[in-house]
């Protein structure tokens, strides 16, 4: 049996805690880092900087180094809030340059089977933000999964009575794809959500 040092075993254990990192990937990453001590030092420094300097915005719950974050302090459309599941979803929305309003991160999606209930998400904080009356539209940009759909439906039921328009990202066929390779549910939603030209 191969003997691995205690510190390397500990590193492998920590790497395997990352998403999609199993035994082989952890071993490959660890040996890559060991071969280049300067990369290992830079990574360790970056990890410490993130630990000490990055936090969640107290307004939108996105990731920031200053509180409130840049997206909450710069001029944007205050009448609309886009609700996303995770902080990285803001990056995807911003890359598109299609949304000009504010954001709100739930930090997950409802999943009773996995024990994720409304109280574990940032839903109460969203409702507090909607109380002042300046928000006219909430765009639900949760993922198109069972959990994301359940979360969108739950939020719609909470927000509609506040006389705020609730919208959902459109479902559709990806640009550049062949119709014959698209699954039936996606085609059905694309047909149901079709628009007039």
Swiss-Prot record:
It holds the Pfam family RecR_HhH. CDD domains: TOPRIM_recR. Belongs to the RecR family. The keyword Isomerase does not apply. Residues 79-174 form the Toprim domain. InterPro entries: DNA_Rcmb_RecR, Rcmb_RecR, Rcmb_RecR_Znf, TOPRIM_dom, TOPRIM_RecR. This is Recombination protein RecR. It comes from the Bacteria. The lineage of its organism: Bacteria, Pseudomonadati, Thermodesulfobacteriota, Desulfuromonadia, Geobacterales. A zinc finger (C4-type) spans 57-72. GO terms for molecular function: DNA binding; zinc ion binding. It comes from Geotalea uraniireducens (strain Rf4) (Geobacter uraniireducens).
């Amino acid at each position: 049996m191969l003997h691995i040092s205690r510190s390397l075993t500990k590193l492998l254990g920590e790497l395997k805690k990352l998403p999609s990192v199993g035994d082989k990937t952890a071993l490959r990453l660890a040996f890559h880092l060991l071969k280049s001590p300067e990369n290992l030092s830079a990574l360790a420094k970056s990890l410490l900087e993130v630990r000490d300097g990055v936090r969640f915005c107290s307004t939108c719950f996105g990731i920031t180094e200053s509180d409130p974050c840049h997206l909450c302090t710069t001029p944007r459309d205050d009448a609309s809030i886009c609700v996303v599941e995770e902080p990285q979803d803001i990056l995807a929305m911003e890359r598109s340059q299609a949304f000009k309003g504010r954001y709100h991160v739930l930090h997950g999606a409802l999943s009773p089977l996995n024990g994720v209930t409304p109280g574990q998400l940032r839903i109460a904080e969203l409702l507090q933000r909607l109380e002042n009356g300046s928000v006219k539209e909430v765009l639900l940009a949760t993922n198109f999964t069972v959990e994301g759909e359940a979360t969108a439906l739950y939020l719609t039921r909470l927000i509609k009575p506040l006389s705020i328009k609730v919208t959902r990202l459109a479902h559709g066929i990806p640009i550049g794809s062949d119709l014959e390779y698209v699954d039936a549910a996606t085609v059905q939603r694309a047909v149901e959500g079709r628009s007039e030209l």
